[in-house]
Amino acid sequence: SDVYKRQTTYNREAYYESMDIVATVEANATAQSAPYLNAEDIVRAREINQRMRELDIHHDPEEFTQLNKEFHSVLFSKCPNERLKDLVVDQWKQLEYHRVSTFRYVPERAQESTREHEQLVSLIEAGAEPAYIEKVARQHRLSTLNTYRKKND
C-alpha cells in the first residue's frame, strides 16, 4: 500500500541519515583517539579484524556486524572527548533501532571492509595525521552506506 511505501521510504531515509551521522562522529572520535592508542590496542583491533575475515558472511552477518562494532570501539576508545564517544554509541543505537544488519544486504562489502580496517590500523600505527585518519575512517563508513544505497534505492 501507499502508506507502507511511504513508511519504508521514511525509515530508509532515517537509516541513511543515521549512517551519515555515524560516519562523521565515529571518524572524528577515531582521529582524536589515534594518538593515544598503544601497541595493545593495535593488536586487539587486528585480532578482531582477523576474526571478521574468517567469518562466513553469508551465514553470520549479525556476528560480522557485532565484530565490526567491537573493532571500531577499540579505535575510538581513547578519544579524550567523552561526550563525543557517547554520541557515537547513541548513533549506533539509532542504527540498531532500524534492525538492519547492513552486511546481510551487502555481503560483498565485507571483504573490502576488512581491507579498509587494516589500512586504518596501519595509518594509526604509523602515526598518520589525525585529519587524514578521520578522512579515511569517514570514507570507510560512507562506502558501506553507498553500496547499501545502490542496492536499495
Question: What are the roles of these predicted feature ranges?
Answer:
Residues 11-14, 18-36, 70-107:
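Hydrophobic, amphipathic alpha-helical faces that serve as interaction scaffolds
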Residues 40-45, 84-88, 132:
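Acidic/histidine metal-binding catalytic segments
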Residues 21, 67-70, 136, 147-148:
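Short, solvent-exposed amphipathic helices
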